[in-house]
Amino acid sequence: MSWLVVLLILYVIWDVNYFIRCVFTVFAGRLFQRKRKVTDTTTIYGLCTSQDVDIFIRHMNNARYLRELDFARFHFYALTGLYERIRDRRGGAVQGASSVRYRRTIPIFHPYKIQTKLIWWDDKAIYLEQQFITLSDGFVRAVAMSKQNITNCNVLEVLKTYPETAQRPEKPEELKLWLDAIELSSQKLRKDK
């Protein structure tokens, strides 16, 4: 009986399902999928359930997209070994910015996949593109870009350990524009102080 009380308290205080899903996603990826190059696209699968929907119980709510992107990012780090290499240098990774474009809803009980790809990097951050694609029609329902700030180590040094990153790709045009918007926002916030 006391373990039920502890479990109930944990569910009230923490989002236990989030942590269970993180562990499951990372370990399932490591156990059942082959390692990937850091430049490869990684894929996880999901299903829009009753816990993911908006108040009208018809489609995934916007907050859940961001949560699912976390799982896909952790999976990417695990399969490519990137987080281990960052951690070996006593570094860390934190979300610096993200932008999601919602193109069409993901209806309740529809399966989907999230594809994650490293699209560019500089000395302080890596930039990922992630796409939500419904399995029934192959339509890209949402696309996200995220800036992963790498702390306490140099990204260029970390990525030198991957032969496939010897040549950095050109910065995609939409990434340039997004980074410009972030810089403008930063300048405005500095002026407001």
Curated annotation (Swiss-Prot):
Family label: Belongs to the THEM6 family.
Glycosylation sites: N149
Superkingdom, natural source: Eukaryota
InterPro entries: HotDog_dom_sf, THEM6_lcsJ_thioesterase
UniProt xrefs under PANTHER family: PROTEIN THEM6 (PTHR12475:SF4), PTHR12475
Alphabetized UniProt keyword annotations: Glycoprotein, Secreted, Signal
Pfam families named in the record: 4HBT_2 (PF13279)
Signal peptide: 1-18
Protein name stated in the entry: Protein THEM6
Keyword Isomerase: no
Transmembrane segments: none
Gene Ontology CC terms, in alphabetical order: extracellular region
Compartments (UniProt record): Secreted
